[in-house]
Amino acid sequence: MAAAAGAPPPGPPQPPPPPPPEESSDSEPEAEPGSPQKLIRKVSTSGQIRQKTILKEGMLTKQNNSFQRSKRRYFKLRGRTLYYAKTAKSIIFDEVDLTDASVAESSTKNVNNSFTVITPCRKLILCADNRKEMEDWIAALKTVQNKEHFEPTQYSMDHFSGMHNWYACSHARPTYCNVCREVLSGVTSHGLSCEVCKFKAHKRCAVRATSNCKWTTLASIGKDIIEDEDGIAMPHQWLEGNLPVSAKCIVCDKTCGSVLRLQDWRCLWCKAMVHTSCKESLVMKCPLGLCKVSVIPPTALNSIDSDGFWKATCPPSCTSPLLVFVNSKSGDNQGVKFLRRFKQLLNPAQVFDLMNGGPHLGLRLFQKFDTFRILVCGGDGSVGWVLSEIDSLNLHKQCQLGVLPLGTGNDLARVLGWGSACDDDTQLPQILAKLERASTKMLDRWSVMAYETKLPRQASSSTVTEDFSEDSEVQQILFYEDSVAAHLSKILTSDQHSVVISSAKVLCETVKDFVARVGKAYEKTTESSQESEVMAKKCSVLKEKLDSLLKTLDDESQASSSLSNPPPTIAEEAEDGDGSGNICSSTGDHLVGSACPSRPQIFRPREQLMLRANSLKKAIRQIIEHTEKAVDEQNAQTQEQQGFVLGLSESEKKDLKTDNRVCTSSVHSESCVIAKGRSQRKASRAPCEKLVSKGLSLGSSASLPPGTGSRDSLPALNTKILYPSVRAGMSGSLPGGSVISRLLINADPFNAEPENLEYYTEKCVMNNYFGIGLDAKISLDFNNKRDEHPEKCRSRTKNMMWYGVLGTKELLHRTYRNLEQKVLLECDGRPIPLPSLQGIAVLNIPSYAGGTNFWGGTKEDDTFAAPSFDDKILEVVAVFGSMQMAVSRVIKLQHHRIAQCRTVKISILGDEGVPVQVDGEAWIQPPGYIRIVHKNRAQTLTRDRAFENTLKSWEDKQKCELSRPPSFSLHPEILSEEEATQMDQFGQAAGGLIHSIREIAQSHRAMEQELAHAVNASSKAMERVYGKPRTAEGLNCSFVLEMVNNIRALRSETELLLAGKMALQLDPPQKERLGAALIEMDQQLRKLTDTPWLCQPLEPGEEESLQQNVMLDLTKRSRSGKFRLVTKFKKEKNNKNKEVHSNLGGPVHLWGTEEVAAWLEHLSLCEYKDIFTRHDIRGSELLHLERRDLKDLGVTKVGHMKRILCGIKELSRSSPAAEA
């Protein structure tokens, strides 16, 4: 390297050259033109470095001069020296002196996390593994430039340092260095720019730039602070030069700035731009610009608390400041762009990068404010992160949260009205304005609680011919109960005689096989004759129960054939311990009225059928329990086979035994399943289907298990469950209402679960949606793919493509096609029979997986309420496959709805975990229980488009009313003798018009009503001018101008009235008198055009309207049945031209130089006013100007030339002189 540098190292002798394995061969000189070319290589030994305090160290990638060449090196920072070598254990380290060094970010599209260390002799380009590590290195390097001792706590306080935050960039126009005032080199003006204040500098000049970046605190303002009777205020903070092309001075309204030199000024806060000469004329106090409502002024940050965090006081002008969190990794790393833009618009101290320290520092800064707003720029994960930190600081009552969508899904941003994506950082001022007008809405947040334990796996089929793979005979016996439950369900729910007969046959075979299996297992496990007798008695009882059931089934069949109408729905009521009880309850009375006393006789055998079925199941249960007891005594391995059973305390057993269900509450009751035959039932739509879907949701006591936790403390809710809604994969409707539901829910598989939520751990908080199964599997695969290959998932489009690829893969593999066998679902304490599905989604907002309305609608119907994210109600839907998820993006499907409820409980069965996702973050959840309960509510900022439109209309109206500028020619105070004579003639004509109107009004009340206000105003104005004796000084011009305006308005309203139905009501003599008065009035108005200060009240095209309208016959005009259809665009265009011309006055060909100059000002071309005035360009010359004439006058810009020519064309169309 020394040879490459061309000079031996001077000074004291250096250590001997290191051996080749330890040589740092990658320290080539890298310097820009104009910097010293001599590189003095300095090295140190590891022993010398070991004696010094290391401030920061780690591996970085160092780029060399050669193309695409980089090497990993280990760097150590000590004081103002940076050391690097191949490894941390190397003997020889290269040195980089940081005494006159500067550091700048140089990432390519904010992706490779690179930064440049610039010294007088070299340029060192380094790359970190992630953005946070890069910013940590930059902060450390910037700090050691001024301080010998680096304090680690200052990492998070970088906002308040006052130093510039450099990044390398190019510019599209000539740009000048704010240090040396010379132009930046290269065609693209490549150099360094401060990401906050846009201070420009050469790389060699950056180290000499003063630390005068945008103020953040009161101390940073310094002596420039303004103190008055109202307290302290902030002055303008000026930055010189590099103004945009369209810059105009706020004082003189003339063009400022230059591309030839560094001149004129721009305020970093209010964005005002002024000439150097006009700077002193501007008010010193800064108004903070258009975003002043959102800005927290530096004067509000004036102290530090005991923990080292800045504290913000609340000045009167800052009632609801904005705290901004930006995820710099979101949106293909476009978050960096938004981070810089927000720092330019607001106080840099109120803008934070979530990837560098998280949201804690910002929330601590703002926690003293009574109210403040938060804007999260990122995806749904970023929003959840900030809300979780708000939970920990308990700030929900103080803050309101808005979302700027930068992520992939952005479901919450869609629901709140902020759109699906935001890529243009130039629209941030408009977005901040919309955020100030946003309304507040509450967002429900839900705790996802988990209790991990092993639960038994459900049977995969309801037939006896299953190929059991269990090793234990007793475990196989347990499945017989499932089969019995399934066939009993078929017998009770099916309306088809063939299905009932088939199920009865299979049921008989199942029971026989069950008895044989029990006997075989019992012989193997016990030799006691007494035990054998007990088991024989139990089997005998089982046979009796089966015979009784078949007999009752036969009676019910005969009763059904005698009636043509199907049975009505029976209301739910709890049964006693024997399975008997009064089926018609108070809730049932409310549902079906007086149907119970007069119900058909068919219900007595149906009730008996239900009781026999329950008794049969209990007999099977007793046999199973007895068998297990014997096995437990003889076989020690039974504990392993039944390891999924949860032990219950005695008090829990007693509580469960009092639960009015058919199934007993033994410790093995988890094996009682919910309708194993549900997927085999045929669809049969009974007339009672609607009552089944709604009657079961009316909150009867029998449908909810006791001790459902927080449900009792919540307001009463009619839990809405629609079983037929999932008929795409299950049986359809469930005839027999409460009877069937009682059988389907006769076993409580959750009775071993601890009811107290203290035993649960909160996995996360759900804001958007929860998914288990298929959608969670896709999200998990995508997250793994993104972790493995982050370069493949850097844009929103690529991410959506990956989701599509992974979804198509699941369409073929169907990994969770039997999810209903792995999970059990319970809504508000009521177990839900599941169809054959691949996933379950629990929705809090009506946007799922990137904008899909998976609920299938936003309106209320007969069964379900309208979905909302502020009603403390969740929507539960079934996921049948990838194709359904894809179609749901186009068509609003509703057949997969399951329920609306306040709490959701999911049991994961078996030994394997199942993918689970919350708001797009997925993981594998081990077997156990998951409960979703309401946690709290957060205030969110919702875009109110109706209010925005109303406000915009009002603002436009105000602009139109205030857009008329003052007169361009100041009128004199007193009229001259010639003008006074002319006004006398004008007054006589006006008096004649008023007299004619009053005569006609005596016989036509309609005219009096229409013109009374205009006549009275004109009369008062004339009385003010002519009513008093004329003084020697003459008439007052202000009074005369008011009179002319009022009389002109009277003439216009009279013209409009005569153009309508009034002309049909007037007599011919009256029309003639009024027409003559109008003609005389119009002639006097034309004469006023010669008086400059009186020409303003005349509308544009006045001459044209007088010549056309007054000379027409009033009768023909009023009776004309033709209407001119003018397009809206043309009307608006004409109205705009009229507004401009009315401000200028008179026909265009009569304009003077002052009117032409005013017309140029209306075109925003004030820079040409002096040129046109010097060349004496009047209205008549203006109408005939062409492109070559404008070039001769000095108009060289093509855009300005086009604007002038278009304006002349419009003037020519409306000018009568041009037409002549």
From Swiss-Prot:
Keywords: ATP-binding, Cell membrane, Coated pit, Coiled coil, Cytoplasm, Endocytosis, Kinase, Lipid metabolism, Membrane, Metal-binding, Nucleotide-binding, Phosphoprotein, Protein transport, Repeat, Transferase, Transport, Zinc, Zinc-finger. Widely expressed. Residues 317-451 form the DAGKc domain. Residues 7-22 have a biased composition (Pro residues). Residues 1-47, 554-584 are annotated as: Disordered. Its EC number is 2.7.1.107. It is an enzyme of class 2 (transferase). Homooligomer. Monomer. Interacts with AP2A2; regulates clathrin-dependent endocytosis. This is Diacylglycerol kinase delta.
